[in-house]
Structure formats: structure tokens, C-alpha cells
């Protein structure tokens, strides 16, 4: 953040200022468990927490000023009193985005948005010829708190911002996209994910479409031609220009998949170029097209795209390859899962000439359709004919049932079952590939990294 005085902050937030007008801050904090020293502390309040209980702690740890909803007479540092500290956090983030005014892109989708974010940021780092000139979302900071905190990291050095928007209920993206004000916005795909919050696939379509409401006046709406719901999104897109990836504007041909990634010819409005992509799977070729569309709409060239896509390294938890031995490959795709992303990962696994093992955990937040969706995955696995499926969790049991696999209620038991089986395959000089996949709460990486540590062949 740039340096601001408490009187400037009061004006931006339309807050009542109590205390010194000239205290200067350039750091934001919302959590006393992290470094609060020399920061402006926002006392956020939610259904299950209230940071107003920790004001004394924030001050004792070095907070220079506080943003609060109620004045506290015992506090010695300046207080900025607002009606809602969460909204105030967003207002400050919006003000800073407008002040710095970087070329900004935003993406959402049911899966792949983090990979698209990483790819886009990599491309734009080449456009800027400076990795420090590109701000991008860290981790899962993609909700109504994380997005403002991301924007509040903006400084005058930033020329580009790449912001990921997530949601598990209606109107969440409607709020965050209006803070971000993207010059280009993209929906990567639509799938049955977070159905407990959205209610139905139609609810997902509507919620993701909210991203286009925040577009700047000349902003571009980018749509996946394979997930085109323009009839529903037309109101949000209004008079904005529309481009398509996996379609007429950005596409791929001559696609070849290898154990290290993919090669393809990228087709774009700027022309064609050969890409060697260090990401596994057909779906990541599509993610690369999405990233290209976003980056080109804020100034990237074909040369930037090639450099950015080819130099980006794999990300743990997202089809991250772990070559344990020449004959044993573990695929860590454990960050999260929905039906489409799971089937995409299975497509990668089926392409290996090896003994192919799927270790799958439950897909969460699917509501009343959860068991049916898990069964559909089992039916899909039957079509691709994997060698072994091991499941863990309550609902993934139906996947094992559908494919005559093995179900476990304990991950340690799964590992203990797999270790001798895999070692036996390796002793016969056979290749083995193990894919781990499941929703974040299932922590299927426990299985993958235990196998890495325990297999001795």
C-alpha cells in the first residue's frame, strides 16, 4: 500500500477520526496472529468472530491506528470509526486500485482459476520485463476479505494486477468485481461445484456471471466457448466487447501430450506461435488459452505469451508431478476437486502406459446431488478402465463400488495397502502412476507424500 495519514484515511472511508490526524500508515492487517507492527488494523466482525475483542492486543503489538465500528475510550492510538469495517476494507481497496490504476484482469470459474491466474501473471511479468511490476492473488485470497487485502498490496511499482475471484454463494463476486474493476474478465468454466451455496448449476452460472458487472467502460468480457451461457450473462456484459477462448478468438491445434506437459500451436488475434507447456493435461492447454486471452487484452504480445507459458513451473497440489523413481510417478492434484476437474485429472492418468492408480477423496459442497455426482465419476472411470481405484471418505465409497475398487475410512490404511502393491509392480520392472485427488478438506496429499516417503524400490 502507499503511505497514507489518518486524516486522509478518514476522508477516504468517510470515517469519524478520534486521535492524531498525522499518523502515517502503509500496511494493513486484520489478524493479530500475524504481524501487526506499524500497520492499520481493521477490526473485522463476522458471525463467529469479532476482532474488536483484540484491540488492546493489536495496539500492544504495534498497530499505529485502528478501523473500528465502536469507539474504545481506553485505546491510545487513533481510531477511525465506520459503520461496517468489512465494507471499509473494500472501500479502501477500491480507492487504491483507482489511485494506482494498473491494467487489471480478473478470472473466476468452477476449476482452474488459480492455474489461469499463475499463467497470466507469468505472461505479464514478461510484458512488464519486471516480475515486481505484477500484483497477483496469493493462495486462496479470493473472497470478500481476500480480494480487498490483495488490492491493498498495490504500490506505485505495479503496472498489472491479476486477481482471482472465488465464491460459494450469490452476490459474492458481484461485490468483489466492483472493487477490482477489471479491464478484462473471464469465466474459465462452469461445473457443479459449491452447490450447497448456489443451489443448482443454474445458480453457479448466474453467480459466476457477476464478474462481468465490474468491467471498466472499455473492458472486455472473455467467455469459454465450451461453457457459453451468453443468454444468461448478456445483461451483465451489456455493451462490452466479447472474446472467446476455445473458440474463434483463441484456440489450439496440433496438440500433443507428453509425460512432461503438452505442445501445441496457439492461435490468437495476434497470430500463431508454437508453445511447449510444462503443465499436464488437455485442460491445462485450455487454461493456457484463457491466460493468453486475459494477458493479450492488457498488452501482452505473442512473444510474452510464449515466454510466460513455457517458463511457468508446476504448482503443488495442481497435477504436480513427483518422480520418485524412474518407474514411479506420483501426481499431486489434491488442492481441490469437483466433477469436471476430477474427470480432467483422470484423463491425464489414463494417458500413461503404466499401472494406473487413482486415490480419490470426497468432493464436498455438492448438496443433495452429491452421491449422484460421485456415481457419475465412477461411471466415467469405468469407461477409461484404470487399474486400481482407492477411495477415502463417506461419499466417495460409491466411486469404488462402481469400479470394483477398494474403499478406506482411514488414509493410513490406504497407504499401508498401496505400498506393498506398488513395490511389487516396481520389482517386476513395471511403471506405476498414482494420482491423488479430492476436495481440500480431504487432504489427499497425505496419501501422496506418505507413498513418496515409504516406497523403497
Swiss-Prot record:
It comes from the Bacteria. One of its GO terms (biological process) is peptidoglycan biosynthetic process. SUPFAM superfamilies: MurD-like peptide ligases, catalytic domain (SSF53623), MurD-like peptide ligases, peptide-binding domain (SSF53244), MurE/MurF N-terminal domain (SSF63418). It is found in: Cytoplasm. Its EC number is 6.3.2.10. GO terms for cellular component: cytoplasm. Its main location: cytoplasm. One of its GO terms (molecular function) is UDP-N-acetylmuramoylalanyl-D-glutamyl-2,6-diaminopimelate-D-alanyl-D-alanine ligase activity. ATP binds at residues 109-115. PANTHER family: UDP-N-ACETYLMURAMOYL-TRIPEPTIDE--D-ALANYL-D-ALANINE LIGASE (PTHR43024:SF1). Belongs to the MurCDEF family. MurF subfamily. This is UDP-N-acetylmuramoyl-tripeptide--D-alanyl-D-alanine ligase. It comes from Haemophilus influenzae (strain ATCC 51907 / DSM 11121 / KW20 / Rd). The lineage of its organism: Bacteria, Pseudomonadati, Pseudomonadota, Gammaproteobacteria, Pasteurellales.
Amino acid at each position: 500500500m502507499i503511505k497514507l495519514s489518518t486524516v486522509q484515511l478518514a476522508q477516504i472511508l468517510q470515517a469519524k477520526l478520534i486521535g492524531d490526524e498525522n499518523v502515517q500508515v502503509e500496511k494493513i492487517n486484520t489478524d493479530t496472529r500475524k504481524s501487526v507492527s506499524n500497520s492499520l488494523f481493521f477490526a473485522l466482525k463476522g458471525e463467529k468472530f469479532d476482532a474488536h475483542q483484540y484491540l488492546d492486543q493489536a495496539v500492544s503489538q504495534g498497530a499505529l491506528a485502528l478501523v473500528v465500528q465502536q469507539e474504545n475510550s481506553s485505546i491510545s492510538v487513533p481510531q477511525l470509526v465506520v459503520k461496517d469495517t468489512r465494507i471499509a476494507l473494500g472501500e479502501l481497496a477500491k480507492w487504491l486500485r483507482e489511485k494506482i490504476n494498473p491494467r487489471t484482469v480478473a478470472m473466476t470459474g468452477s476449476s482452474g482459476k488459480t492455474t489461469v491466474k499463475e499463467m497470466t501473471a507469468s505472461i505479464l511479468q514478461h510484458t512488464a520485463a519486471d516480475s515486481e511490476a505484477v500484483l497477483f492473488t496469493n493462495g486462496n485470497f479470493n473472497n470478500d476479505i481476500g480480494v480487498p487485502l490483495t488490492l491493498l498490496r498495490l504500490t506505485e511499482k505495479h503496472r498489472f494486477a491479476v486477481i482471482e475471484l472465488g465464491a460459494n454463494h450469490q452476490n459474492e463476486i458481484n461485490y468483489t468485481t466492483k472493487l477490482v474493476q477489471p479491464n478484462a474478465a473471464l469465466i474459465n468454466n462452469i461445473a457443479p461445484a459449491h452447490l450447497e451455496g448456489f443451489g443448482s448449476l443454474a445458480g453457479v452460472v448466474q453467480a459466476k456471471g457477476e464478474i462481468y458487472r465490474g468491467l471498466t467502460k472499455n473492458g472486455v468480457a472473455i467467455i469459454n466457448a465450451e461453457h457459453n451461457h451468453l443468454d444468461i450473462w448478456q445483461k451483465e456484459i451489456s455493451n462490452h466487447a466479447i472474446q472467446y477462448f476455445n473458440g474463434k478468438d483463441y484456440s489450439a491445434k496440433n496438440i500433443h501430450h507428453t509425460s512432461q506437459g503438452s505442445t501445441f500451436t496457439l492461435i490468437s488475434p495476434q497470430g500463431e506461435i508454437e508453445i511447449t507447456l510444462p503443465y499436464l493435461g488437455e485442460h491445462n492447454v485450455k487454461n493456457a488459452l484463457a491466460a493468453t486471452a486475459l494477458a493479450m487484452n492488457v498488452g501482452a504480445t505473442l512473444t510474452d505469451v510464449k515466454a510466460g507459458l513455457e517458463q511457468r513451473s508446476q504448482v503443488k497440489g495442481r497435477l504436480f508431478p513427483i518422480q520418485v523413481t524412474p518407474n514411479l510417478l506420483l501426481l499431486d492434484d489434491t488442492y481441490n476437486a469437483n466433477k469436471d476437474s476430477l474427470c480432467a485429472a483422470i484423463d491425464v492418468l489414463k494417458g500413461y502406459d503404466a499401472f494406473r492408480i487413482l486415490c480419490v477423496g470426497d468432493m464436498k459442497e455438492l448438496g443433495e446431488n452429491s452421491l449422484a455426482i460421485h456415481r457419475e465419476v465412477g461411471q466415467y472411470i469405468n469407461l477409461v478402465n484404470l487399474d486400481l481405484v482407492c477411495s477415502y471418505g463417506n461419499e466417495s465409497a460409491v466411486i469404488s463400488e462402481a469400479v470394483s475398487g477398494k474403499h478406506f475410512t482411514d488414509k493410513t490404511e490406504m497407504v499401508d495397502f498401496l505400498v506393498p502393491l506398488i513395490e511389487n509392480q516396481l520389482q517386476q520392472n513395471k511403471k506405476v502412476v498414482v494420482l491423488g485427488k479430492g476436495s481440500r478438506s480431504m487432504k489427499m496429499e497425505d496419501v501422496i507424500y506418505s507413498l513418496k516417503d515409504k516406497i523403497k524400490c
